[in-house]
């Protein structure tokens, strides 16, 4: 069954999609720093990230300084477990 999942990579990329396994989001050469699940809060215009990956664990936000987010999410807030990612700078690609 497909689920809305995300991972973050050592290079800072947020990889997001609807997949079977978190590893399906990784590209060759990516090193995963954890992952979880996502949903869009349309009322608050926010990308809500939560949970953890059973393969890679909880996202290790402290290991990145800049989160590279797909351009299609520009203008949306980004929260993990209901908290803003204040310590991480967000850039779009």
List each model region and its residues.
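Eukaryotic phosphoinositide-binding membrane-targeting regions
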Residues: 1-93
């Amino acid at each position: 069954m497909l689920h809305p999942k995300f991972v973050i990579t050592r290079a800072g990329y947020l990889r997001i999609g609807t997949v079977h396994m978190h590893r399906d989001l990784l590209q060759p050469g990516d090193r995963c720093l954890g992952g979880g699940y996502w949903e869009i809060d349309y009322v608050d215009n926010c990308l809500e990230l939560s949970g953890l990956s059973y393969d890679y664990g909880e996202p290790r936000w402290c290991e990145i300084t800049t989160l590279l987010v797909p351009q299609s999410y520009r203008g949306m807030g980004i929260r993990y477990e209901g908290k803003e990612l204040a310590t991480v700078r967000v850039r779009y690609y």
